[in-house]
């Protein structure tokens, strides 16, 4: 079903189901000892989407060269390490506020070794925030930072809601937009980064991943892969969930607003983690995806 401007979801539907899928991939990475996320698998089981529960429980076996749990684990390990390192590097540099936009089932507020006094803000839909908070409490998990939740749609006035939760616009912050931008309309994407800039003190940091052209989700190479995955029970169709059409190139957008941006391709990110990027049609379709970090001013 195509997106609408005011659509809503939980962790089992629409965009929310992609957060559960990502958590399942983190669970595979953790099982392979590539990252350490002890909460990923329990959260996936709590959501209860059958295909992802079976995936984390090892009940789905490789059916094609493109669907390989080990490959999924490596890919998600690269992405997770990128954002983990980003936040920890910022914290070690004295940045005491972290903002995780579209936090989904992200458990960094519970699993990263944050310095004392760090405040971690999680921004996402109310149903998503409530589910994760209650589930982690039931698991006995305790935050390793001061965790503050902002239950709001990023298409609404999330900046005001963030300030109401105590965000300090006079102190630097570290921001992440992980796996987020394709799910925003062009105007909302630009507004997101304009709001981040307006809220950020000099020395603030930002990390994001960017798909230059969402038409990749309609690419025949990806569609063929999607059909094979559907046969295994994966129902998420990214082509229906992402917003298509031209949009600003975020690096240019941010550079014009005072951010110094450093980017690497998805293949370079794999290489930096000791993995070879795959050489098949699906990998080729996403070869232009980039991972970027930025610093404001200075």
From Swiss-Prot:
Function: Exhibits S-adenosyl-L-methionine-dependent methyltransferase activity.
Record keywords: Methyltransferase, S-adenosyl-L-methionine, Transferase
NCBIfam families attached to this UniProt entry: mthyl_TIGR00027 (TIGR00027)
Keyword S-adenosyl-L-methionine tagged: yes
Family: Belongs to the UPF0677 family.
Protein name, per record: Putative S-adenosyl-L-methionine-dependent methyltransferase MAV_0778
InterPro entries: Ppm1/Ppm2/Tcmp, SAM-dependent_MTases_sf, SAM_mthyl_Trfase_ML2640-like
EC number of this enzyme: 2.1.1.-
Entry-linked Pfam families: LCM
Sequence positions that bind S-adenosyl-L-methionine: 124, 153-154
One GO molecular-function entry: methyltransferase activity
Gene Ontology process terms (BP): methylation
Organism expressing this protein natively: Mycobacterium avium (strain 104)
Protein's UniProt keywords contain Nucleus: no
Enzyme superclass (EC): transferase
């Amino acid at each position: 079903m195509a997106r609408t401007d005011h659509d809503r979801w939980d962790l089992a539907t629409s965009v929310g189901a992609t957060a559960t899928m990502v958590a399942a991939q983190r669970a595979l990475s953790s099982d392979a000892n590539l990252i350490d996320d002890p909460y990923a698998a329990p959260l996936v089981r709590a959501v209860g989407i059958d295909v992802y529960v079976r995936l984390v429980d090892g009940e789905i076996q490789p059916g094609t060269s493109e669907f390989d749990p080990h490959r999924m684990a490596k890919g998600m390990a690269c992405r997770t390490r990128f954002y983990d390192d980003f936040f920890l590097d910022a914290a070690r540099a004295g940045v005491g506020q972290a903002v995780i936009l579209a936090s989904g089932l992200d458990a960094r507020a519970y699993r990263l070794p944050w310095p004392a006094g760090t405040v971690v803000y999680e921004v996402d839909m109310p149903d998503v925030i409530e589910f994760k908070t209650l589930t982690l409490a039931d698991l006995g998990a305790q935050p390793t930072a001061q965790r503050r939740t902002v239950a709001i749609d990023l298409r609404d006035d999330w900046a005001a809601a963030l300030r109401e939760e105590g965000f300090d616009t006079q102190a630097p912050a570290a921001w992440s937009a992980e796996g987020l931008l394709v799910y925003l309309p062009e105007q909302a994407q630009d507004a997101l980064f304009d709001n981040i800039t307006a809220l950020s003190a000099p020395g603030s940091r930002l990390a994001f991943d960017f798909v230059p052209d969402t038409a990749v989700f309609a690419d025949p190479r990806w569609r063929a892969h999607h059909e094979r995955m559907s046969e295994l029970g994966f129902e998420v169709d990214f082509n229906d969930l992402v917003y298509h059409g031209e949009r600003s190139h975020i690096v240019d957008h941010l550079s014009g607003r005072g951010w110094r941006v450093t980017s690497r391709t998805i293949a370079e990110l794999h290489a930096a983690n000791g993995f070879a990027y795959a050489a098949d049609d699906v990998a080729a379709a996403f070869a232009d995806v980039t991972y970027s970090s930025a610093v404001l001013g200075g």
